[in-house]
From Swiss-Prot:
Positions with biased composition (Low complexity): 22-33
Subunit field text: Interacts with PPDK1.
Organism placement in taxonomy: Eukaryota, Viridiplantae, Streptophyta, Embryophyta, Tracheophyta
Gene Ontology terms for molecular function: ATP binding; phosphotransferase activity, phosphate group as acceptor; protein kinase activity; protein serine/threonine kinase activity
Entries under InterPro entries matching the protein: Kinase-pyrophosphorylase (IPR005177), PPDK_reg (IPR026565), Pyrv_Pi_dikinase_reg_chlpt (IPR017409)
Protein's organism: Arabidopsis thaliana (Mouse-ear cress)
Name of the protein in its database record: Pyruvate, phosphate dikinase regulatory protein 2
Keyword field: Cytoplasm, Kinase, Nucleotide-binding, Serine/threonine-protein kinase, Transferase
Known function: Bifunctional serine/threonine kinase and phosphorylase involved in the dark/light-mediated regulation of PPDK by catalyzing its phosphorylation/dephosphorylation. Has a much lower phosphotransferase activity than PDRP1. Can use ADP as a high specificity substrate and GDP as a lower affinity substrate, but has no activity with UDP.
Binding site for ADP: G242, V243, S244, R245, T246, G247, K248, T249
Length: 377
């Protein structure tokens, strides 16, 4: 992967100080960016408008959300939002930005000590559906002002070229994520890429079998949530089981978006699971387990958001009750050795889903010794 604009990037000893306090400049950030940054802050556990623990010399991260208006939701015009940050990374895409976001997030996993040990932070800012050069250049200029790095996924060769040139001229360190992949596939297939963006008028949008299969899977999964319609468990591709708050519903939804019909069944202490569960082919059933203290913490957070009384809280998140529920689930798993049991403690949904799909396909494909998940395009 090539890094562009390295020569124009600030040297560490000449990097301008990050303004703090009331003198911090206001940055122009789109409403989409503002909402996305807020979501990132919530997922990472950082409270909005509150400083995180830091050393005296480390920058403070603060995310402040402006009140969106109906007009702002429809347009991508810039608004004034004050953001105090450590290092910034811009993600620019002519589509949803999914590829750029997930690629960079995967890479950032290699630098966890940057925020943990150095007391600093990295803020990623997503700019999606960037399909005109004027807006592209405006974003890169803003990146230059912030001393940000820029990653882009632009299918149009002209736009990708403009992004590289602008980053080089403005001294912005940049990476073209999609370009090398497109070039490699073009060479392998022996054909030229279309160069059309995801939403281009000339692009053929076919509603193929895979599309309808995905819609059908999502609809099925929604209807089968939380043990509903147990008589349909045999129709599921994958069945997830486990005690409350092990992530069955979000995991089911995530896997369903990949075209798999997923059902989930909760284990409630003292209540035997439906008989139809034990009639499902064992390789399709996946048990979820989690560490005791982690599950208790998740449940405590849940009951606080619901505002229940102390007695109800103890009946749901009390340590003795949680331990008994986990033991109850373990006994069911022991009686069904054909089920794969996965520890979801501190795992992202994507990680658990990847494990489940690998095991699911391992059990189906016996034609090769190397596990694979195959798709046709």
């Amino acid at each position: 992967m090539n890094l562009h604009g390295v020569s124009g990037h600030h040297e560490p000893n000449s990097e301008p100080p990050i303004p703090t306090g009331s003198s911090s400049p206001k940055l122009k950030i789109s409403p989409k960016l503002n909402r996305w940054s807020r979501g990132r802050a919530l997922r990472s556990g950082v409270k909005l408008d509150r400083p995180i623990p830091r050393s005296d010399n480390s920058p403070r991260r603060q995310v402040t959300e402006a009140q969106p208006t109906d007009e702002a939701d429809k347009k991508t015009t810039a608004i004034d939002v004050e953001v105090t940050a450590g290092k910034s990374i811009y993600l620019v895409s002519d589509g949803t930005g999914w590829t750029a976001e997930h690629s960079v997030n995967a890479a950032l996993g290699q630098f966890e000590d940057f925020s943990l040990n150095r007391g600093s932070s990295v803020n990623t800012h997503l700019f999606s559906w960037v399909e005109d050069e004027e807006r592209l250049i405006e974003i890169i200029k803003q990146a230059a002002k912030e001393g940000a790095m820029c990653f882009y996924t632009l299918a149009n060769p002209s736009m990708a070229k403009s992004a590289k040139q602008a980053c080089d001229q403005l001294g912005v360190l940049s990476v073209d994520i999609l370009g090398p992949i497109i070039e490699g596939i073009a060479s392998h297939l022996g054909v030229s890429p279309s160069g059309l963006t995801r939403g281009a008028p000339g692009r053929v949008k076919t509603l193929n079998d895979a599309y309808f299969k995905r819609i059908e899977a999502i609809e099925f999964t929604i209807k089968q949530d939380d043990g509903t319609l147990p008589e349909n468990l045999s129709k599921a591709d994958i069945v997830l089981v486990g005690v409350s708050r092990t992530g069955k519903t979000p995991l089911s939804t995530y896997i369903a978006q990949k075209g798999y019909k997923v059902a989930n069944v909760p284990f409630v202490m003292g209540v035997e699971p439906p008989r139809t569960l034990f009639q499902v082919e064992p390789r399709k059933v996946f048990g979820l387990k989690i560490q005791l203290v982690v599950l208790q913490a998740i449940r405590r957070t849940r009951v606080k958001t619901l505002g229940v009384d102390t007695e109800a809280e103890n009946n749901y998140s009390g340590i003795d009750l949680v331990r008994k529920e986990l033991d109850f689930a373990s006994r069911i798993y022991e009686r069904n050795p054909g089920w794969a049991v996965i520890d979801v403690t501190n795992k992202a949904i994507e990680e658990t889903a990847a494990v489940i799909l690998r095991l699911y396909h391992d059990g189906r494909d016996t034609s090769t010794t190397v596990p694979r998940i195959s798709k046709r395009y």
